[in-house]
Structures are given as C-alpha cells and as structure tokens.
Regions:
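Non-catalytic interaction/Regulatory regions outside core domains
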Residues: 1-25, 29-109
Length: 109
C-alpha cells in the first residue's frame, strides 16, 4: 500500500477526520492532507516527555482533546500517524483506523 492509498482509505472509512499526516521511521512526512506537516509529530514527542517524567516507556498512542477538535497520534511498526478529527469522533475507532493504515504501509515496505 502506498502512503497516498493509506490516506485515501482513512478518509473513506472515517468521515470525522479533518487532517492526517503519515510519517516514516525517520520522522519524515510520507503523505499528508489538511496541512499538518512535520510539526504534527511533536505531539508524540511531548507525550514521550510526559511518560519519561513518570518513568514510563515511549507512548504507542495519545489523544488530545480541544473544544473544537480531537488530535490523535499513533505509532505502529516504526511508523507514525497524526490526525485531527471532529470533537465527536469515537477515539477507539480513530485509533484502530490509524493503526490499520500504518500496518498496511509497513506490510508494503
């Protein structure tokens, strides 16, 4: 699966996603829609910093709730995805969809 195909699949299965960025193992953007760009990966870095303060390993996923949107970040098989969704998006489904997209990308490599 190409990164562009992964984005298309995500947008097809979830009408609640507004923006998505997919990242390779080095942290480079491989595909994005909605203008998230490389800075979006910082959400995982911030979550890792918080985990480290608590003596925990790096996070696999995180969610940030804002009044007007939810932000989701996921790591899977060395890849990462960050998405902005409507505030009423179902977190479990968004995490599942992002993880499946990353698995598809990892399997194609």
């Amino acid at each position: 699966m190409t990164p562009e195909a992964a984005l298309a699949d995500l947008l097809e299965v979830s009408d609640r996603l507004r923006s998505i960025a997919l990242f390779d193992e080095s942290g480079a953007v491989v595909a994005e829609i909605g203008g998230l760009g490389p800075a979006a990966l910082g959400i995982l870095g911030a979550a890792d910093d918080a985990a480290r303060l608590l003596g925990r390993p790096p996070v696999h996923q995180c969610e940030v709730g804002l009044p007007e949107a939810l932000v989701f970040a996921v790591r899977e098989q060395g890849l990462a995805a960050v998405a902005v969704a409507d505030p009423d998006a179902t977190a479990g489904l968004v995490f599942y969809d992002l993880r499946e997209a990353l698995r598809g990308l990892a399997g194609a490599a």
